A protein has these predicted regions:
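Feature marks short, highly hydrophobic, charge-poor N-terminal signal-anchor/signal peptide-like helices
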Residues: 1-10
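Transmembrane-cytosolic junction motif
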Residues: 15-38
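Charged, low-complexity intrinsically disordered regions
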Residues: 30-46, 50-52, 57-225
Length: 225
């Protein structure tokens, strides 16, 4: 009985590995098709430099064994864009956990202090890593549904203006959107991210969400510097 059990166990492991490989290959092909549609370059291989280049962004400096993959890069609607799947791990041995998610970066023409906007609940996981309090707003609904943190409150209020607040609230009210959208701004990067890898057909719609967020940043943030 034991040899049969062992053989069955090995077969199950092989099936899981093969299924994982096929799934990764299909995603790679689908992401390549998205890149072609958007007129962007596509690099499927692991990119550890990306993690080092943007390690000032909170979500990209967590854990260990950090790398980007399925990287789309290029210009979209006049903005320099990076889109990629991302991985990091925490713990070791039996307590090892792997995290995979989608990340979008738009290059800004000026440098800014750190600002993080996350749906309430998601931010609690990283609250201890950020040494400043949640910022409150006149919109009680926005303050209930989002955590906003920055060492520069004036900058946070400038970014979270009335139009931005309404847009973000509409995103959590709409079931068709990914409601786990998080926003980070620091240095010259405007980033949005999610808690998992988006389906390839969700990449373009969420790239357009990134462009919308950029359009809601007040012009004076760039002209007065």
């Amino acid at each position: 009985m034991e040899p049969l059990f062992f053989i069955g166990f090995v077969v199950i492991i092989i099936v899981i590995l093969v299924a994982g490989y096929i799934s990764s290959l299909k995603r790679r092909e689908a992401m390549a098709a998205v890149a072609a549609k958007l007129g962007m370059q596509f690099m499927p291989n692991k990119d550890r430099y990306m993690a080092r280049r943007y390690n000032f962004l909170d979500k990209l400096r967590r854990g260990s064994n950090r790398y980007a993959y399925n990287v789309l890069s290029g210009t979209y609607q006049g903005h320099e864009i990076l889109i990629f799947d991302y991985h990091y791990k925490t713990g070791s041995g039996k307590n090892t956990h792997h995290y995979y998610f989608s990340f979008f970066i738009l290059q800004l023409p000026a440098s800014f202090p750190e600002l993080i906007i996350c749906p309430e609940g998601i931010f609690s996981k990283i609250a201890q890593a950020v040494g400043y309090d949640d910022i409150d707003f006149e919109s009680h609904e926005f303050s209930r549904k989002f955590c906003v943190r920055s060492p520069n409150k004036k900058f946070a209020y400038d970014v979270c203006n009335a139009r931005m607040i309404e847009y973000l609230l509409s995103s959590v009210r709409s079931p068709k959107d990914n409601t786990d959208l998080s926003i980070e701004i620091e240095e010259r990067a405007l980033a949005i991210s999610f808690n998992s890898c988006l389906a390839p057909d969700k990449i373009e719609p969420n790239l357009n969400r990134l462009i919308t967020v950029r359009s809601l940043l007040p012009d004076y943030l760039f002209t007065r510097r």
